[in-house]
Amino acid sequence: MKKERTKVFGRGANECRRCGRRRGLIRMYGLYLCRQCFREVASELGFKKYW
């Protein structure tokens, strides 16, 4: 059997903290949230645009 490698670099290396999705990731300010989760949580984080 082959050992499963973890992705070390590139777009698939990071995932959303809430749902684990790897696409549409917002890494700015160390958020590591996908865009869908960010929209749900943005007001709690203090982003005024999404109040």
Swiss-Prot record:
Bound cofactor: record note: Binds 1 zinc ion per subunit.
Assembly notes: Part of the 30S ribosomal subunit.
Keyword terms, alphabetized: Metal-binding, Ribonucleoprotein, Ribosomal protein, RNA-binding, rRNA-binding, Zinc
SUPFAM superfamilies cross-referenced by the UniProt entry: Glucocorticoid receptor-like (DNA-binding domain) (SSF57716)
Similarity remark: Belongs to the universal ribosomal protein uS14 family. Zinc-binding uS14 subfamily.
UniProt function note: Binds 16S rRNA, required for the assembly of 30S particles.
One GO MF term attached to the UniProt entry: structural constituent of ribosome
InterPro entries linked to this entry: Ribosomal_uS14, Ribosomal_uS14_arc, Ribosomal_uS14_CS, RIbosomal_uS14_euk_arc, Ribosomal_uS14_sf
Cofactor: Zn(2+)
Protein name, UniProt field: Small ribosomal subunit protein uS14
A Pfam family the protein falls into: Ribosomal_S14
UniProt xrefs under NCBIfam families: PRK05766.1
Highest taxon, organism lineage: Archaea
GO biological process, one term: cytoplasmic translation
Organism name: Archaeoglobus fulgidus (strain ATCC 49558 / DSM 4304 / JCM 9628 / NBRC 100126 / VC-16)
Chain residues that bind Zn(2+): C16, C19, C34, C37
Any single GO CC term annotated in Swiss-Prot or TrEMBL for this entry: cytosolic small ribosomal subunit
